[in-house]
């Protein structure tokens, strides 16, 4: 008689399905890097707001900073998508993360050792917005390259959970650091988080691809 195939417990199947995209090594590196990076980013957002309000005592200034962060993303994300289609996505992400690291370090040094002015914070905010305009489309399309279409839905769900978790954890950590240390420490920690992500990208092993010019021909 034919032996009936063994059935896996429902709980085991559901857990495996929930974490399906993590079977891809590159996505695992990306996933844990995002946890670190997004937590640092939300820490910096809270610290930046605290700094701007202490410099100006103006709620309007806080709104202007949010505007400077978001307007480049609104205006230039399309160009970031075009760039992501034409060049290696990982290289774009390494470059954008390096720019973000430099800007966070600049914010740290100005806050810790200089007489920081609100206009300087504004320029850095705009620079980070420009960085995101090119980082976001490359990062989103890079997920498809890492997991393929089969596990894409699961990867999107995990990315969403990471984003929302970081949105809770990051501000909480920022509050502790602001009360125990300084606002500059938040900026420094965020810079370190970018460095961790850059190292993760550089350790990924990507499959060799045909030359883009060959593909067009």
Give residue ranges: language-model regions.
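Alpha-helical transmembrane-bundle signature of multi-pass membrane transport and export proteins
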Residues: 1-217
């Amino acid at each position: 008689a034919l032996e009936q195939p063994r059935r896996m417990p429902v709980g085991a199947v559901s857990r495996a399905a929930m974490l399906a995209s993590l079977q891809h090594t590159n996505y695992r590196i990306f996933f844990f890097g995002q946890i670190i990076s997004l937590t640092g980013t939300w820490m910096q957002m809270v610290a930046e707001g605290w700094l701007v309000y202490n410099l100006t005592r103006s709620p309007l200034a806080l709104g202007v900073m949010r505007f400077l962060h978001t307007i480049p993303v609104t205006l230039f994300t399309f160009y970031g998508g075009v760039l992501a289609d034409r060049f290696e996505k990982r290289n774009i992400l390494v470059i954008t993360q390096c720019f973000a690291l430099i800007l966070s370090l600049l914010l740290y040094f100005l806050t810790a050792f200089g007489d920081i002015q609100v206009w300087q914070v504004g320029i850095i905010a705009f620079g980070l917005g420009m960085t995101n305009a090119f980082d976001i489309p490359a990062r989103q399309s890079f997920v498809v390259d890492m997991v393929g279409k089969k596990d894409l839905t699961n990867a999107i769900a995990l990315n969403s959970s990471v984003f929302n978790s970081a949105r809770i954890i990051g501000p909480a950590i920022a509050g502790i650091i602001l009360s125990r240390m300084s606002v500059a420490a938040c900026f420094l920690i965020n810079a370190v988080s970018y460095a961790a992500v850059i190292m993760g990208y550089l350790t990924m092993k990507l499959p060799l691809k045909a030359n883009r010019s060959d593909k067009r021909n």
